[in-house]
Every structure is written in C-alpha cells, then in structure tokens.
Curated annotation (Swiss-Prot):
Gene3D superfamilies: FAD/NAD(P)-binding domain. This is Methylenetetrahydrofolate--tRNA-(uracil-5-)-methyltransferase TrmFO. HAMAP family: TrmFO. Its main location: cytoplasm. GO terms for molecular function: flavin adenine dinucleotide binding; tRNA (uracil(54)-C5)-methyltransferase activity, 5,10-methylenetetrahydrofolate-dependent. The lineage of its organism: Bacteria, Bacillati, Bacillota, Bacilli, Lactobacillales. It catalyses: uridine(54) in tRNA + (6R)-5,10-methylene-5,6,7,8-tetrahydrofolate + NADH + H(+) = 5-methyluridine(54) in tRNA + (6S)-5,6,7,8-tetrahydrofolate + NAD(+); uridine(54) in tRNA + (6R)-5,10-methylene-5,6,7,8-tetrahydrofolate + NADPH + H(+) = 5-methyluridine(54) in tRNA + (6S)-5,6,7,8-tetrahydrofolate + NADP(+). It comes from the Bacteria. FAD binds at G13, A14, G15, L16, A17, G18. Catalyzes the folate-dependent formation of 5-methyl-uridine at position 54 (M-5-U54) in all tRNAs. The keyword Ubl conjugation does not apply. GO terms for cellular component: cytosol.
Length: 448
C-alpha cells in the first residue's frame, strides 16, 4: 500500500497504549486525531471517561532494575513516556513497587492530551478502520464486537482471538533436570518436550491440592463467556480423579528412558501421569506447562505447581491467567514495529498485540507511536535492540511460535542473553542485563 498523504495520524483508543502513542506522535510535530468512545459509550470495565484509566490495580509493579518491568519503566522514562511521567507525578507509597493515585494520574494524562495543541480529541465510537491516514489501533482487550470484526477482516479473517487462556511459563534454568526427561509422545519427530513423571501417590496428592486450591475472583465483565473455548486445569480436575489422565497429564507414549533412576510404581515402564513442558521462546530459556491454563490465585499456582517433579524450585516468569481478551496472532500479522504486514499504514498497540500488563501496553504504544511518526515523515523504522526490555517485548510477540502464542509480560527470559559465562548470582545477572540494556538504549537514541 502506498504512503498516506494525510496531514495527521489517527489513534483509536485512549487507554494506556493509545495515550502513549498519541503523545509520542504529537511531540514529533504531527497532528493527531485521538478517538475515544468513553463519554459516548461506556465499557463494562471502565469507571470514568479519563484516558489511560487503570482498571484492576493502581500498581505499575516493581521499580528495581533487577526486575524486568522496572527496567522497562526506566527505558520508557528515557524515551519521555507520558504514562511514566504522570505516574511519577502521582506516586503513592508502595515499598519497592511503583503505585499511583489512579484518579489523579488518569486526570493528569487526560488533561495533558486534551490541552496539547496538536491533538484533537474526538469522543466517538469507531466501528470501521479508517483508511484516510496512518492509523494506530489501541482499543484494548475488550475491543467492541463491531471493530473486532473489521480487524478480523483486514487481517484476512484470521488471527483475532477472544479468550486469553495462558498456561504458566517458567525459567528453564530453575528446573531440576535430574527429575525430568526429554521426549515427544510415541517418539514422533524430534524430542521436543520436557516430561515431569508422577507416581500414583504423587498424582493423588497433586490432584487433591489442585482441586482444593483457591481460585482468583472473576471480573463482572468476564463471567458471561468465561468457560467458552477452553477449560481451566482445576475445573478439569474437579470433573473426576482421572479426567486429567486423559487430557494434559496423559502418560501414554511417554515411557521412562532407560537411564531413568527416579521414583516409579513398581516395574511399570510408563509413569502414572506426566506433566509436559514445551519450549516457549527461540532461545530455549522459557518453558510453558502444557495444557495448564488456570484461574488459580498466583500464590496457589506456585504452591500447587511446585509439587510437580522437577519444578520444586521453579521460577514462574508468568503465572497462568484466564480472562476475556481480544488479541491478535501477532507473529503472523505484525512486524516488530507493530505495523500490519498486510497494510503498513495500519499499526496496533496495547494488549490486543499480545503484550500483557499496564506498563507493557504503554510500552507498545510508545513503540507504535514513534514508528507511526517515522512512517509519516518517511523515515526508517525504529527497532530497539533485543538487549533492551522495550526491544525484546515487540520481538517476542512478533516472533513467538504462532501455533502456541499467548500474551506475555516483560521478563528477563525474553531479553537477549548476556555474552560470556553465565553469571550464577541472579541479582548480579539481572543487574548486568539492565546495565547493558540502558547503555544500548542510550547508544540507539544517540544515533537518531
């Protein structure tokens, strides 16, 4: 598609991603038409008409550079993020986390955007994708059905999902490899799964813990269609003692290897039950627990899933979640700049791209906004280094395995590994990754 000749850029949606995108475009001297339907049409989850409203929590999570989201926030500060700047101005005490007065914060973001001379705020619902100008779509996880259909169509009728059913993801380096074995079911293809075998006694204890664990409460806007399309592992377990044995914990075709020396039931060659772990990123540093989408509270997930042999000390880089969510098959549909592969004048940002979390959503809006502005000015696209948090997140969501793609929080597992011998002390390793990230970001910005 040819370059747009319009004298402005559209941004649809004034949540965290859309607000950030609009600001980044306007600060580069380009007029913005910012559309927001709240004020004309309410949503089930928002309480106000303010921009960048925080719906479920007032926390932007950890602020330390030894925390991946802390690193991402520092990178965003260096990129003049409107979300970070107004968040800082409205901070409330929260220990090592960054929490904000959500009303004061949202009002200040709204006021800054509404008073910006290059931003025209239009309170209206958009049901068609504009084709008059470069457009950033940032309509959030509960995109209206009408617009969702248009996004579905513009992407060839593929790759727009309505339920986020994500299994937990763990750091491979924290798996006890002496208790697991590499094998694919029936030895089909290459050995692609790490298998965590259970004896009958281990399975029964695990089943009891799983069926009695505390679930997270549902939001009112998630209840109606919550169980369509997928089933939480705890619900499956409650349907019968053996239900999981015919589902994600099926042991058939996963015989013990000849050199296996761990516990087993008598002389059986096959475990009573098996939990499979599947590689989640190209670097092989992250693995997800296959079929374990769940709505347990995070503390309960840690307690129960660490009963799985080999995962006793596992670190969870993302806990399982289940909620209604509209997100795209970004690996097939988007470039690393969040542009549509089929229409480069169309960009997406926010949770619909497969990033998970307030900070991550704002970061995606920052990347999309910068690149929309560069596209408008006919400048080369800006792809941040994979050694940075703000570079690794777009890279992950646009390069993940499409077949198993699920929304992702920022974490050190998706950032390019350090060169040289692995630093064993985790805090020192994360400090080194953060130091390299900020240096590489500064170098990138200096070259612009």
């Amino acid at each position: 598609m040819s370059q747009s000749t319009a004298t402005y850029i559209n941004v649809i949606g004034a949540g965290l991603a859309g607000s950030e995108a609009a600001y980044q475009i306007a600060k580069r001297g380009i007029p913005v038409k910012l559309y927001e339907m709240r004020g004309v049409k309410a949503t089930p989850q928002h309480k106000t008409t303010n921009f960048a409203e925080l719906v479920c929590s007032n926390s932007f999570r950890g602020d330390s550079l030894t925390n991946a989201v802390g690193l991402l926030k520092e990178e965003m500060r260096r990129l003049d993020s409107i979300i970070m700047r107004n968040g800082e101005a409205n901070r409330v005490p929260a220990g090592g986390a960054m929490a904000v007065d959500r009303e004061g914060y949202a009002k200040s973001v709204t006021a800054e955007l509404e008073n910006h001379p290059l931003i025209e705020v239009i309170r209206d619902e958009i049901t068609e994708i504009p084709n008059d100008a470069i457009t950033v779509i940032a309509t959030g996880p509960l995109t209206s059905d009408a617009l969702a259909e248009k996004i579905h169509a513009v992407n060839g009728g593929d790759g727009f999902y309505f339920y986020d059913a994500a299994a937990p993801i763990i750091d491979k380096s924290t798996i006890d490899m002496s208790k697991v074995y590499l094998k694919s079911r029936y030895d089909k293809g290459e050995a692609a799964y790490l298998n965590c075998p259970m004896t009958k006694e281990e399975f029964m204890a695990f089943h009891e813990a799983l069926t009695t664990a505390e679930e997270a409460p549902l939001n009112s806007f998630e209840k109606e269609k919550y169980f369509e399309g997928c089933m939480p592992i705890e619900v499956m377990a409650k349907r019968g003692i053996k239900t999981m044995l015919y589902g994600p914990m099926k042991p058939v075709g996963l015989e013990y290897p000849d050199d296996y020396t761990g516990p087993r039931d008598g002389e059986f060659k096959t475990p009573y039950a098996v939990v499979q772990l599947r590689q989640d990123n190209a670097a092989g540093s992250l693995y997800n627990i296959v079929g374990f989408q769940t709505h347990l509270k995070w503390g309960e997930q840690k307690r129960v899933f660490q009963m799985i042999p080999g995962l006793e000390n596992a670190e969870f880089v993302r806990y399982g979640v289940m909620h209604r969510n509209s997100y795209m098959d970004s690996p097939n549909l988007l470039t690393e700049t969040f542009q549509s592969r089929s229409n480069p004048n169309l960009l997406f940002a926010g949770q619909m791209t497969g990033v998970e979390g307030y900070v991550e959503s704002a970061a995606s809006g920052l990347v999309a906004g910068i690149n929309a502005a560069r596209l408008f000015k006919r400048e080369e696209a800006l792809i941040f280094p994979q050694t940075t948090a703000i570079g690794s997140l777009p890279h992950y969501v646009t390069h993940a395995d499409s077949k198993h793609f699920q929304p992702m929080n920022v974490n050190f597992g998706i950032i390019k590994e350090l060169e040289g011998p692995r630093i064993r002390d985790k805090k020192e390793r994360y400090e080194a990754i953060a130091s390299r990230a900020l240096a590489d970001l500064d170098t990138c910005l200096a070259s612009l």
